[in-house]
UniProtKB/Swiss-Prot annotation:
Keywords from the named record: Hydrolase, Immunity, Innate immunity, Nuclease, Nucleus, RNA-binding
RNase NYN domain: residues covered: 598-750
Family: Belongs to the N4BP1 family.
Functional summary from the UniProt entry: Potent suppressor of cytokine production that acts as a regulator of innate immune signaling and inflammation. Acts as a key negative regulator of select cytokine and chemokine responses elicited by TRIF-independent Toll-like receptors (TLRs), thereby limiting inflammatory cytokine responses to minor insults. Has ribonuclease activity.
A GO molecular-function annotation: RNA nuclease activity
Compositionally biased region (Pro residues): 804-813
Protein name listed in UniProt: NEDD4-binding protein 1
PANTHER family per record: N4BP1-RELATED, NEDD4-BINDING PROTEIN 1
Species this protein is from: Danio rerio (Zebrafish)
EC number: 3.1.-.-
Region described as CoCUN: spans on this chain: 813-858
């Protein structure tokens, strides 16, 4: 290739044939087909984007499967120019289609033509964050637009105009499919569910369970998005490999056959394993350690193995196991298309759902009704419904049980195997209420079966485990408490002791998760030997062979309320405020004409935002709620004033995008502010409120009394007295009073009309007008009889706090006090000097400036 470059703004494409893709990796397709020709595209961008491109280089190469090289400046003659004017060379190398898409993405990244924000339900966040980011990468690749997850429920789309529109359309399509919850035709739905489940399990993360719960139509759309032309063969190979191994139920049955039905003394040789339909059965069976470390995330194999070991120790079931094994072998010899016999498959299904906490008779009935080939999720739904019906009929019997205070130390071992089986059935029914009410939640990443870590299957909220070391027929019951749903009404039935023997009954101490701040429901089983948390126990009452805590006695609630409250985080106003911010809010203003007779609304943005944020956080959502409230009332002349420095990023300012949205709608104005040597210089935003109210005759929405501006001018004084509208917030509800000027003033609808400006009505002063004759008569009597204490005028406008009546009047004002009051009143009311002199002479005892001002206004 030549080292020369074309002129700025031009590009040159050179096609080169290579034997393998960039990076030295060769896909399965390339190994079987003719290698594709690679394209080299070189173009220029502004130099000031170089840092951003260096950060995006790994992402571009990963998503678009190209080699991205930042060549830099080649023409150093223009090095004296600014970075905004100089340009650097970039090179993309790869397949022609990949290079074209990558170039569109880089161009949109450096010079975005369009930027948009798109909202989606929070429950869809797993699409953009799950599957190890594959869906998000494929969305970037298909649209060539930059898609950023700002927060759960909000995306930022930027890039070329066409790419942004395509990405927005794709996201809106996902949202529509999610909200419609539409299912696929019966012939396609099982196949789509199976493929999607395989796809998600191969890329399992903490969002896997949420992805599996998406609607079928959305699953099909996501599969189409994921099966891009980059790796079509790989996905097919993965699907074929999964289909050749087993389904979750048959895989579980194979594991049970290998671990339980065969003699533990006989080693498992590779020659025996390929017997099941010729399928590769060497997965997870090389050793016991490998089997422990490679458990599937969504199976209950550890607990299933415990149940199998429990059954294996019972001699009465030995011949049943062997006969089942023989039946299985016979079925395999006669029909290679079946992995296990129907009887074994039924037994495995029953055991599988029993480990999830459901009753055996309910599971057997549902499986026989629906058939063994039914989808696992549909079986689970039917089992949950049947369990709830059964529990509703047996609830009265469970709540009527009372514990027996007999100690466990003197328990005898006289119960037989049949009696133990019956007791196990009673225990499962007693725990079924807890188990059947649990919802399917996303699993934690800590794994399954680890006793000191959180369980990843919330449905299995209680596990019955046999004590191997004890000589009696006692069983340990481990109750896993979910503190989130633990209410006062549920404590007694959930902690009712289980009757294990005629003479021994126990109360079991639930140990819940100590991670109370985590929003996801967590359940833990805490080992007594490795944990020191929880209330102290009486060691003399604890069994030596028991690994978990038990408390003897009748009390159904071993832990006190104080211990529960000490674990929970304290409830504060800020915690509730932060919780309310998780609920998405969108500012929606209908594009329809309003009422022309309504006054201009002038909102004190700082006052409203701080009121919504509990006077600790500047909540921009409060401003948006206030604007929407007045918009719904028909106001179209709305102005919000906010200081300009509130545009800066600050942890105490929430949801600043509402400010930009209102500014774009010309409903918000920023008052000027600047910084000089680190000091902020801001104009008083209240002055802007008063100036605009004076110019437009509008109403100021604020809880500030604006007392500092009463003496500025007569017009401002009348605005402060007549046109202030107060408000309050009840969570996210903006409320204003129906009587903004008091109970004797005009109604809110009349107060907000433009016509009321000509003859303003001040309710407190109207009340005073009725009392004015008595006030003046009392003042006249006081001047005629100054020594009479009963005629001293102590009444005035009801909104002012006047001195309390006293047995003797205070002394009259001195001449200096009268002169000072006269000067202040002249400043406030410059056009009423004669009336000021008359009122001062009629009220020689009055020193309250506010009371004198009220008399002047009356």
């Amino acid at each position: 290739m030549s080292t020369t470059r074309p002129l700025l703004g031009m590009k040159r494409i050179t096609e080169v044939t290579c034997t393998e893709p960039p990076g030295g990796r060769q896909s399965p397709t390339a190994s079987r087909a003719q290698p594709d020709s690679l394209t080299v595209d070189e173009f220029t961008v502004h130099e000031d984007k170089q840092t951003e491109l260096k950060c995006s280089k790994p992402k571009v190469e990963q998503v678009f499967q190209v080699t991205f090289t930042i060549i830099g400046l080649l023409d150093h003659t223009g090095a004296h120019g600014s970075k905004a004017s100089r340009q650097i060379w970039l090179q993309l190398k790869g397949k022609k289609e990949d290079v074209y898409k990558a170039k569109e993405y880089v161009k949109g990244l450096c010079d975005p033509e369009l930027q948009k924000e798109e909202w989606y339900p929070v429950d869809m966040h797993c699409i953009f964050a799950g599957a190890r980011g594959l869906f998000l990468d494929r969305l970037l690749r298909d649209t060539s637009a930059e898609v950023q997850v700002l927060e759960p429920g909000r995306l930022k789309l930027s890039g070329c105009a066409e790419a942004v529109v395509m990405a927005q359309s794709r996201v809106q399509q996902f949202v529509a499919l999610f909200q419609e919850k539409r299912s696929l035709p019966a012939d396609r739905e099982p196949s789509v569910k199976r493929k999607f489940k395989t796809f998600v399990e191969d890329r399992a993360d903490k969002y896997a369970m949420e992805l599996l719960l998406l609607p079928s139509a959305l699953k099909e759309e996501l599969l189409g998005l994921a099966q891009s032309p980059t790796q079509p063969i790989v996905i097919i190979d993965l699907e074929q490999d999964r289909s050749q191994t087993s389904t979750p139920v048959t895989d579980l049955s194979n594991r049970i056959l290998d671990t339980t039905f065969e003699d533990k003394t006989s080693p498992i040789t590779p020659e025996v394993m390929p017997g099941l339909n010729g399928r590769p059965c060497n997965k997870r069976r090389s050793s016991e350690s490998e089997q422990r470390d490679t458990k599937r995330q969504y199976s209950l194999e550890r607990r299933e193995e415990e149940q199998c070991e429990e059954r294996e120790r019972e001699p009465t079931k030995t011949w049943t196991v062997k006969s089942a094994k023989g039946t299985l072998a016979a079925s395999e010899m006669t029909n290679e298309s079946e992995a296990v016999s129907p009887e074994t498959n039924l037994r495995c299904l029953v055991n599988f759902f029993r480990t999830m906490g459901y009753q055996q008779d309910v599971v057997e009935r549902v499986v026989r009704e629906t058939g063994q080939t039914e989808d696992t999720f549909l079986l689970l739904e039917r089992i949950v419904e049947e369990t709830q019906k059964t529990q509703s009929t047996q609830g009265a019997q469970r709540t009527s049980r009372t514990p027996d205070p007999s100690p466990c130390a003197n328990a005898s071992s006289t119960s037989t195997s049949n009696r133990l089986k019956e007791k196990e059935r009673v225990q499962m029914r007693a725990l079924a209420e807890i188990k059947c009410k649990e919802n399917i939640r996303p699993p934690s990443t800590n794994g399954i079966g680890q006793k000191n870590q959180t369980s990843s299957v919330p449905l299995a909220s209680a596990t019955l485990k046999r004590n191997n070391g004890a000589q009696t027929d006692l069983c340990e019951v481990i109750i896993i408490d979910d503190e989130e749903d633990f209410t006062e009404t549920e404590r007694k039935p959930r902690l009712t002791p289980l009757d294990l023997k005629p003479e021994s009954r126990f109360d079991y101490l639930p140990r819940g998760s100590s991670q109370t701040m985590v929003p996801v429901r967590m359940e833990t089983v805490t080992n007594l030997r490795s944990s020191s948390q929880g209330p102290p126990l009486r060691t003399s009452d604890t069994r030596p062979g028991c690994s978990y805590q038990t408390l003897p006695g009748r009390a159904p609630l071993p832990r006190s309320e104080a211990q529960y409250t000490s674990k929970a985080a304290p409830l504060t106003g800020m915690s509730r405020f932060q919780q309310s911010l998780r609920t998405p809010y969108r500012l929606i203003l209908q594009n329809e004409p309003g009422s022309p007779n309504l006054r201009h609304i002038i909102i004190d943005g700082s006052n409203v935002a701080m009121a919504h944020g509990l006077h600790r956080v500047f909540s921009c959502r409060g401003i948006a709620i206030a604007v929407e409230a007045f918009w719904r009332r028909g106001h179209r002349e709305i102005t919000v004033f906010v200081p300009q420095w509130r545009q800066k990023k600050d942890p105490n300012i929430t949801e600043q995008h509402f400010l930009n949205q209102l500014e774009n709608l010309r409903l918000l104005s920023f008052t000027p502010s600047r910084e000089v040597c680190g000091h902020r210089i801001s104009s008083h935003d209240d002055r802007f409120l008063l100036h605009l109210a004076e110019k437009t005759g509008g109403v100021i929405v604020t809880n500030d009394n604006l007392r500092d501006f009463v003496s500025q001018s007569e017009a401002w004084r009348r605005i402060i007295h007549e046109r202030l509208l107060q408000f309050t917030f009840v969570e996210d509800h903006f409320m204003i009073p129906d009587d903004p000027l008091g109970k004797h003033g005009p109604h809110l609808d009349e107060f907000l009309l433009k016509d009321s400006r000509g003859s303003p009505i001040i309710p407190p002063l109207r009340t005073d007008l009725r009392a004015t004759p008595s006030v003046y008569s009392q003042a006249a009597q006081s001047t005629a009889h100054p020594s009479s204490p009963s005629h001293w005028p102590h009444s005035g406008p009801p909104d002012w706090h006047l001195p309390r009546p006293s047995p003797s009047p205070p002394p009259q004002r001195s001449p200096s006090e009268t002169t000072e009051l006269k000067r202040k009143l002249y400043d406030i009311f410059p056009d009423q000097k004669q009336r000021i002199d008359r009122i001062l002479s009629d009220n020689p005892y009055m020193r309250d400036l506010n009371a004198l001002s009220g008399l002047l206004l009356g």
